[in-house]
């Protein structure tokens, strides 16, 4: 939206500076994108006077002009057809840069004649897209002064960004109203002229689609002199980039920018029959309308059917042709379509310099239809821009009277008909009950309460922090005497009072009526975006000033160290597994109950009452089935080597869940190559990765209780274990049961671990802190032991025991063989273990090693009934 300072002052009595106006506009939500001051940009171009001209001796189209300037007369060669003696023109002296082309004027020789400057056109100064000659200035222009003063360029142009909900701000009058409410001047009272009709129009009006066109008004004006519009009007339009055409067209453009009401003028002599507003039809069925006094109902006689000519289309004012369809709303007569409603007029009924009689239209069209047609046909006009943001239907008839009065005054009078109207005005807006305390509730702006003291007729100042309830009690007790506690001038410092709220809303056009502590608010007809109390709060706040809202420090949130610690730990686990080659996935927390039944006993409380789909009707008891489903999909795409993990909740019961780190592994550890036969992943690869996670958490699998009793049924019964720390179950790891894999159509071995992060103990030291790593300078020694133990004895317990047997000496324990066969007693197995021994303070001698072996063998025999194999 563009407008000039002088245009604004037509409706706003203000002495505010350009800067103050711009700051206020931005503060009330009408962001100023740019202020164009062409006077500053073109101040070096001055007024000059052509004393005489003579033909150029070597060029027919050039003239040699003697030009009077402030520094004396100059000779300038000019090719403009309108260059002649006796006119004031715009001069660019030597050294001045021309905007269009960015070149500097130099003294030159043109076809043998000296030229000491340049006489400028509008096009060369970027004042118009094209021009036919040099600029001619008024006769009273003073030679040597900047030409901008006489061309109307000393009028700054505001360019503002209007949000889609503020169609009322697409008018200078609407902007003036907002600035007046902000306190930047006083809104001038708008005088609506009373235009008396001198004849009755015989043009009939028929609105076929009331929803598409809720209001259509027009009047006929005869015997006009369609001369160029006056300088003041041309300057306003030129400054905002609108090309002046003629008095009639310029007035319609002026009305659109001044009041936000698009208008259109038809050459009445080019209109046949009557006016019909309807959706475009496949075959142009144009009714021949009878003549007579217009009314709501029109008599349609003898329809004239004209076949549609797709090659011709609708010829618009932009000299382009458009093919219309049934969704387009058109204005037509018996000759065909004369305008695309709300968007653009047709060239066949356009006004020109010979136009004397017009039909002047002011209407309201459906915003969605206008927007849809404009988008489809790719036509952008000021009219469309306003209609698709809704206009004030209650102002349409007033706008028609203002425009009529302007046209009559500019075109030296004429004859006017009565206004022909079809449709209704905007119905009254819904009244909103606005509680006095609602403003503070939403924005924090404290409401100042003014109480009358009957004793001294003064005012008591209170705030909502003293509560409106207290105010009610005081007001209802007529006998209460109040002494002012704050000076009277402080009453408007801390906040608004109810009267202040009403004043703001009234200046914005809202009707208000206060009953006790509730303001009954009726939005004006031009505010289509005011529907709820929050909309009213926004209006009050933007005018009152966002900068006046008191800054309140947010309360400091207490940091939950446990949650923070868990979050850091989870992040570390993710990085560890990612470094091991795992990919993180995030899957749905819901699953099919049929699949869930394979993994756990179903619980009624975990069924979803309103599932997204029948396939996802159960809360997952474990993440494993989701990961298996990913494995199945990848195998179907010939991707065989996979390592995935996910951190997420497992749902145990109603309001009971635990966060699990779940990983799955399948495929080859390394593929076959010239240097290796390759091998597949096994359970020990998974165990190694789990040990790394445990190690970073400050734990050790060796310290856990390892048991293969009661592992989940979806694990292989003899190739899986539970991990516990005391009574806390930390998780499971092992090979997935073949029956489960068969259900998922997976033929490869799959290994998984599940770690219950919720049950992991907090590390005693700072998370991630390692003990100092010390390398002994003394000789390491290794001893191999073969023990015969019970077949069902877990080997891990023995390894864990040896690791903790003598921490000062034992550096490593490695299982390198397990044997069970006929050479051993029934129910027995043999294990071979290599123990690494090293002291930090000395070299171990034979006595030290023998003593260690003797004690270890004795303790293994006592604790595990294991005997040393000979």
Curated annotation (Swiss-Prot):
Cofactor note: Binds 2 magnesium ions per tetramer.
All copies of domain RPE1 insert, residue ranges: 450-498
Residues the record lists as binding Mg(2+): 529, 535, 538-539
Cofactor(s) recorded in Swiss-Prot or TrEMBL: Mg(2+)
Domain FDX-ACB per the UniProt entry, residue ranges: 776-869
Cell compartment(s), UniProt: Cytoplasm
Annotated B5 domain residues: 427-551
Protein name: Phenylalanine--tRNA ligase beta subunit
Organism expressing this protein natively: Rickettsia bellii (strain RML369-C)
């Amino acid at each position: 939206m563009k407008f000039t300072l002088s245009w604004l002052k037509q409706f706003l009595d203000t002495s505010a500076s350009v800067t103050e106006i711009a700051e206020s506009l931005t503060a009330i939500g009408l962001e100023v994108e740019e202020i164009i001051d062409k006077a500053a940009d073109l101040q070096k171009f001055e007024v000059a006077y052509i004393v005489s001209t003579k033909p150029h001796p070597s060029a027919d189209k050039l003239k040699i002009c003697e030009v009077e300037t402030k520094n004396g007369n100059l000779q300038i060669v000019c090719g403009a057809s309108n260059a002649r003696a006796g006119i004031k023109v715009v001069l660019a002296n030597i050294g001045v840069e021309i905007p269009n082309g960015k070149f500097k004027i130099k003294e030159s020789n043109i076809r043998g004649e000296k030229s000491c400057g340049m006489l400028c056109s509008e096009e060369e100064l970027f004042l118009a897209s094209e021009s036919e000659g040099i600029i001619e200035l008024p006769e009273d222009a003073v030679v040597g002064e900047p030409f901008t003063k006489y061309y109307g360029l000393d009028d700054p142009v505001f360019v503002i960004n209007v949000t889609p909900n503020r169609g009322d701000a697409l008018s200078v009058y609407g902007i003036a109203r907002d600035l007046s409410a902000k306190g930047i001047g006083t809104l001038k009272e708008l005088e609506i002229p009373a235009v008396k009709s001198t004849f009755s129009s015989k043009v009939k009006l028929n609105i076929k689609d009331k929803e598409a066109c809720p209001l259509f008004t027009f009047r006929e004006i005869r015997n006009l002199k369609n001369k160029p519009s006056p300088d003041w009007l041309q300057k306003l339009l030129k400054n905002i980039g609108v090309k002046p055409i003629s008095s009639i067209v310029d007035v319609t453009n002026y009305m659109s920018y001044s009041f936000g009401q698009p208008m259109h003028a038809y050459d009445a002599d080019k209109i046949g029959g009557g006016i019909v507003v309807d959706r475009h039809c496949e075959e142009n069925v144009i009714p021949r309308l009878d003549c007579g006094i217009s009314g709501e109902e029109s008599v349609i006689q003898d329809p004239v059917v004209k076949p549609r000519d797709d090659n011709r289309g609708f010829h618009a004012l932009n000299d382009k042709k458009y093919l219309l369809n049934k969704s387009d709303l058109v204005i037509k007569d018996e000759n065909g379509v004369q305008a695309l409603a709300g968007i653009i007029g047709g060239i066949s009924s356009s006004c020109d310099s010979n136009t004397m009689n017009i039909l002047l239209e002011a209407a309201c069209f459906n915003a969605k239809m206008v927007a849809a047609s404009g988008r489809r046909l790719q036509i952008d006009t000021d009219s469309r821009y306003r209609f698709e943001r809704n206009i004030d239907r209650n102002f349409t008839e007033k706008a028609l009277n203002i425009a009529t009065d302007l046209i009559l005054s500019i075109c030296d009078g004429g004859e006017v008909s009565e206004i022909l109207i079809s449709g209704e005005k905007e119905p009254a807006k819904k009244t909103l009950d606005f509680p006095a305390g609602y403003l503070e509730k939403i924005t924090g702006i404290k409401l100042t309460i003014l109480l009358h003291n009957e004793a001294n007729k003064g005012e008591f100042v209170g705030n909502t922090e003293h509560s409106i309830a207290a105010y009610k009690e005081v007001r209802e007790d007529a006998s209460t005497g109040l002494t002012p506690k704050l000076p009277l001038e402080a009453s408007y410092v801390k906040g608004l009072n109810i009267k202040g709220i009403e004043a703001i809303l009234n200046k914005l056009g809202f009707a208000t009526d206060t009953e006790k502590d509730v303001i009954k608010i009726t939005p004006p007809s031009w505010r289509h975006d005011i529907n709820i109390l929050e909309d009213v709060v926004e209006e009050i706040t933007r005018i009152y000033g966002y900068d006046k809202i008191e800054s309140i420090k947010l309360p400091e949130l207490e940091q939950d160290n446990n949650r923070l610690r868990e979050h850091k730990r989870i992040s570390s686990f993710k990085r560890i597994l990612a470094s091991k080659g795992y990919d993180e996935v995030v899957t749905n927390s819901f699953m099919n109950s049929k699949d869930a039944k394979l993994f756990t006993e179903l619980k009624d409380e975990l069924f979803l009452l309103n599932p997204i789909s029948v396939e996802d009707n159960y809360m997952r008891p474990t993440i494993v089935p989701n990961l298996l489903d990913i494995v199945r999909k990848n195998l179907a795409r010939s991707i065989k080597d996979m390592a995935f993990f996910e951190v997420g909740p497992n749902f145990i019961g109603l309001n009971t869940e635990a966060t699990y780190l779940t990983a799955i592994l399948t495929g080859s550890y390394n593929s076959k190559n010239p240097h290796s036969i390759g091998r597949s992943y096994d359970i020990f690869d998974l165990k190694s990765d789990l040990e790394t996670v445990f190690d970073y958490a400050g734990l050790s699998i060796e310290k856990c209780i390892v048991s293969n009793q009661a592992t989940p049924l979806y694990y292989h019964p003899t190739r899986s274990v539970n991990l516990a720390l005391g009574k806390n179950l930390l998780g499971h790891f092992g090979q997935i049961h073949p029956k489960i894999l068969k259900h998922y159509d997976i033929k490869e071995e799959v290994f998984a671990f599940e770690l219950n992060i919720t049950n992991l103990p907090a590390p005693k030291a700072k998370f991630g802190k390692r003990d100092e790593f010390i390398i002994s300078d003394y000789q390491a020694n290794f001893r191999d032991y073969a023990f015969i133990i019970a077949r069902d004895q877990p080997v891990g317990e023995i390894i864990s025991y040896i690791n903790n047997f003598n921490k000062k000496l034992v550096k490593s324990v490695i299982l390198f063989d397990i044997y069970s066969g006929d050479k051993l007693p029934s129910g027995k197995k043999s294990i071979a273990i290599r123990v690494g021994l090293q002291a930090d303070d000395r070299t171990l001698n034979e006595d030290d090693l023998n003593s260690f072996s003797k004690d270890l063998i004795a303790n293994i025999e006592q604790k595990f009934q294991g005997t040393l194999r000979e």
